[in-house]
Amino acid sequence: MRKIILIFVTIVLPCLLCARNDDKSTDMLLREIDGIIRNRQTYGAEKEARISDLKKLLSEATSDEQRYGFCGRLFDEYRAYNLDSSYVYAQRKQELASHLNKQDYLDDAAMNMAEVMGTTGMYKEALEQLGQIDKKTLSDYLYPYYYHLYRTIYGLMGDYAVTEKEKKEYYRMTDLYRDSLLQTNASDSLGHVLVMADKCTVHAQYDQAITMLTDFYRKPSLDDHSKAMITYTLSEAYRLKGDKKGQKHFLAL
């Protein structure tokens, strides 16, 4: 189910957002979603076409630097779409990073592998993978990804923990890495707003989260993927608040 939601957020929602859905009724939006689902093969074909083009560019690349870049783009295309393939390209990134002898490339590839492990439920393996990264030498631009993975993995471990003691400890670690993310991301960035909204909902401050997300959504410079992330997070805030109408509307928006 988690994979289906991720695919919906990354593929289907951006298609709807292209048409300026801000003022449409929920029923109208849901009818559009029905149409999107009926034509899901079309959107899947578009995804596969992008992947095919990237694979062609990868095969024609003349340097390991170029190959690393194309493998990174293929990993991005495959994440939440085909986890086996995303792991393959994370491994290829790691091999190329070794040839290039670039530590930040090695760290990024290792985190890609940890991301796939965490998504497939291999939480301890993901933490072991992250534990091999030397935080002291980590490049500044990788810190948000690093903290995000720890926060996400510990959060999932908390969700599925058997004992209350384990659950409490995992959620404590989730809070620590959430706070680290808030300190790392720029205060006016999408990442900061999403993490802050997450923190608000955890502490039952639903209206504060909704206001924050709604204000950020109105920014004219947002791309469709960013809008999709915000509207999905808004739907979750409304769900936790117990507002089914709001949840339904923003899940459709």
Task: Indicate residue ranges for each PLM-predicted region.
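A "functional boundary" signal
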Residues: 4-8, 15-253
